[in-house]
């Protein structure tokens, strides 16, 4: 989708982008090779230079560049070209805020493997691993997960981000992640009734009572 996008270019909004598509200009290559059209002639040279820059940055696999120039609501357009560089992540906490709370578990998926990070075991390994990816895919991560991680580990994550909360909302799906899953017909066998509050209880049950089953349920919920 990224190579079909023009909305990241200066002076191009959704309306102008759609107008380009309607004229048959569907890709960057189409634009660079199109016949001169009076409607865009004045700006064609400048836009062509901008598109050449996009081509170069895509060749360099610079996801952050595109993340910074795309409108925030359009970051999903990064996915097709950078899907192999995505890391899907979700965190669970003890229920406290950024300053009094702490991360209990983190679950990640890189397209091939699921990994779990547990407080008191291997949580610090997450910071080493997260920088192997270019894009972080979350649900409400821009508002919660990423700031919490940055504050907890005292680190800055400069990754490009795709926050599915905003993408799903634009498609008519609202509520929390688990609510969206239900609306999309996705089920979690054995996890009915488990929510963020119960996840805190599961952590406490594991931490204070060494209940391994509680941890396994928490990790299943986390992913």
Q: Which residue ranges define each predicted feature?
A:
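Acidic, Mg2+-coordinating catalytic module of metal-dependent nucleases/exonucleases
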Residues: 185-223
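Two-metal-ion RNase H-like nuclease active-site motif
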Residues: 84-94, 222
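Short conserved micro-motifs on helix faces and helix-strand junctions that flank
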Residues: 10-11, 87, 160
